[in-house]
Amino acid sequence: MILLSDNDLVVKLAQCDLLDEALSSLEAKRSECFVLSTIKHSLRLENPDRSIERYVGSPQAFERINDFLEHCSVLPEAPILDLIDHLVDIPEIDVGEQALFLHAKSNHDNNLDYFMLTGDKRALRAICTYDQFQEFEFLRTKVVCLESCMMDMIDYAGFDYINEKVSTARPQIAEEKYDKVLRTAFGKERTQEHCLDCLRHYSNDIRWLLSY
């Protein structure tokens, strides 16, 4: 199994101390998770105070991300494929996401088993409404977003366990860095039914792509 992950989802899972649970729910190990080569610079990990304040939201997340990066793999330079012509046509897709999509297409073409993990629903929505969306057919059922990842983990570890993890993490995270979906779906008074309804609602418009 190959997991291709963007920075955003790594941060959100680290904030909640759910990195390993996410991998386990996808039957993968840390070494099978590939991150962008720019992640350390993008999150300013060389400057702990700035990284925590501007990017990762808590000291706990900062420590977990650094530990995670010691064991996961780094993506090489993205292959140049015809898909790039479509990617540059979609302004909502940034350079990092472009690289993930190119690696995903390469894995598909080489019959490699993979999932793409991303917290960038803006890019995913843009693909779903792209006038040549058939060019992204290879992604169908291969994308894991925050919402589908949470549903996978609830199936794997149970709602009470995941809800406790998210609820415990919330006070540790700077409010402006805490995801609004997690704020809405999880909490001490939340039920599993409420949580799943929220997660489905927030991911419904990209359902075509999702693994869950």
Walk through the language-model features, giving the residues of each.
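Active-site-proximal, substrate-binding regions of enzyme catalytic domains
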Residues: 1-114, 121-212
